[in-house]
């Protein structure tokens, strides 16, 4: 197993729908059988926010969750290297796509009281950021008028602390590419874009991270969990012994059961 999941064709979605006017503002919707209303997972793919990594590889996770009775709305978004990608466009696309669940709910029988976000790697950053949007003050470039309320959020080996990601030069400087520069020069941007700086969120947050992750150090998830708990959040972390960076998105992995159980528990 391992990184090969990135290159394996995933099961097809039920529908590919645009949430905005740009060619990259779309999502893949997968629906479980039955009349609903269905709980929903908004899924954010990883790839260090870079254009060369799209949503295809996260389709395996989406299909597995949908097989467990959860509707999945997997978002594509403009990334670094795409026109309009990077700060703020990447984050605003995530926000626009998440809010579009309201438009999908009626036709597709989705339960707006049971919506969570889940993301992997850079997508873990976006998933927790979506849960924090209500903390962003009006007037900020990332502020939204009426962000969709989430019931919980899950980070799978996520880059949930952008300042630390900058310090460690994750992905050979991926945070700098996303944000447009260092935190000492762009403190305001980092403050409203980095999930760890927006705690407490007031919802349940779950973090899963493998001990053998050589892409995103486990310390980033550990530090977020400690900061969120100190701030009063219900934030729990599971350390997955022997798991690499990609095991958490691979339904064939021995660790997949913990991922699925975590999502199901949040939506129970």
Tell me what each language-model feature is.
Residues 207-209, 213:
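Short beta-strand/loop motif that positions the catalytic acidic residue
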Residues 99-168:
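Primarily recognizes the serine-hydrolase "nucleophile elbow" in alpha/beta-hydrolase
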Residues 52-61, 74-114:
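Catalytic nucleophile-loop/oxyanion-hole region of alpha/beta-hydrolase
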Residues 33-37, 41-64:
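Short, surface-exposed "cap/lid" segments of acyl-processing enzymes
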Residues 9-12, 22, 164-197:
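Mobile cap/lid helix-loop segments that gate and shape the active-site cleft of serine hydrolases
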Residues 1-35:
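N-terminal cap/lid segment of alpha/beta-hydrolase-fold proteins
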Residues 243-254:
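Catalytic histidine-centered segment of alpha/beta-hydrolase-like enzymes
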């Amino acid at each position: 197993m391992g990184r090969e999941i990135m290159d394996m064709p995933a099961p097809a979605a039920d529908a590919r729908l645009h949430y905005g006017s740009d060619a990259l503002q779309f999502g893949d919707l997968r629906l479980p059988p039955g009349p609903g209303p269905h709980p929903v997972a908004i899924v954010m793919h990883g790839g260090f926010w870079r254009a060369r990594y799209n949503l295809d590889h996260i389709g395996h996770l989406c299909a597995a969750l949908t097989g467990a009775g959860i509707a999945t709305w997997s978002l594509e978004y403009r990334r670094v290297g795409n026109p309009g990608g990077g700060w703020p466009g990447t984050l605003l696309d995530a926000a626009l796509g998440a809010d579009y669940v309201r438009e999908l709910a009626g036709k597709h029988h989705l339960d707006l009281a049971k919506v969570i976000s889940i993301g992997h790697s850079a997508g873990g950053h976006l998933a927790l950021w979506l849960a924090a949007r209500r903390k962003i003050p009006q007037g900020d470039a990332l502020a939204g008028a009426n962000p969709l309320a989430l019931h919980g959020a899950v980070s799978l080996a996520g880059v949930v602390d952008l300042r630390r990601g900058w310090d460690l030069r994750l992905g050979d400087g991926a945070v700098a590419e996303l944000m447009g520069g260092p935190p000492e020069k762009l403190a305001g941007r980092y403050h409203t874009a980095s999930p760890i700086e927006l705690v407490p969120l007031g919802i349940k947050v779950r973090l899963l991270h493998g001990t053998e992750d050589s892409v995103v150090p486990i310390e980033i998830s550990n530090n977020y969990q400690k900061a969120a708990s100190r701030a009063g959040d219900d934030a729990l972390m599971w350390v997955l012994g022997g798991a690499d960076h990609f095991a958490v998105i691979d339904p064939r992995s021995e660790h997949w059961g913990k991922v699925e159980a975590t999502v199901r528990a949040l939506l129970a």
